[in-house]
Amino acid sequence: MNKRAQSRSAARLAAVQALYQHEMEATPVAQLIHEFHQHRIGAIIEDAEYADADVPFFDDIVKGVLARADEIDAAITARLASGWTMERLDRTMKAILRAGTYELIARGDVPVGAVVSEYVDVAKAFFDGREAGFANGLLDAIGKDVRKK
């Protein structure tokens, strides 16, 4: 993986963490982004080194998800199984799906397959294979919905 791809992968992981924090604590977006810029991205915390991330890409994902939350949640909800709601999803999975869906909707410069693959990898960092498969299927379906040619 080249340096640009690595920095984008790190940005995606950091964005999911930031979105999770926002969901848990309702941290204002400016404060949230500042905290990640100053204390998380590229830092070493408890002997874990956080990779350098593509900071503008991180900012775009976090701000974009929060600005377009209703549109993103509607796209996800449309692909959930009957009887499922956003509230039923684990908060980490919700952050993964929201970030991935934002990229599918707003970042036409990133291929669908790359978005799906990247967020499946993020899901694997937090969950076992079943949840990663869930993220894969849902993001792939959303990609087909929003990137119709």
Curated annotation (Swiss-Prot):
One GO cellular component this record assigns the protein to is: cytosol
What's the protein here called? Transcription antitermination protein NusB
- Name of the gene encoding the protein in the UniProt record: nusB
GO molecular function term, any single one: RNA binding
In the record, the note on similarity to other proteins reads: Belongs to the NusB family.
Tell me which HAMAP family the record gives.
NusB (MF_00073)
InterPro entries xrefs: NusB-like_sf, NusB_fam, NusB_RsmB_TIM44
Keyword field contains Transcription regulation: yes
Q: Kindly list the residue ranges recorded as spanning the membrane.
A: none
Write out the entry's keywords from A to Z. Answer: RNA-binding, Transcription, Transcription antitermination, Transcription regulation
Functional description taken from the UniProt entry: Involved in transcription antitermination. Required for transcription of ribosomal RNA (rRNA) genes. Binds specifically to the boxA antiterminator sequence of the ribosomal RNA (rrn) operons.
What's a BP term from Gene Ontology annotated to this protein?
A: DNA-templated transcription termination
The domain of life is Bacteria
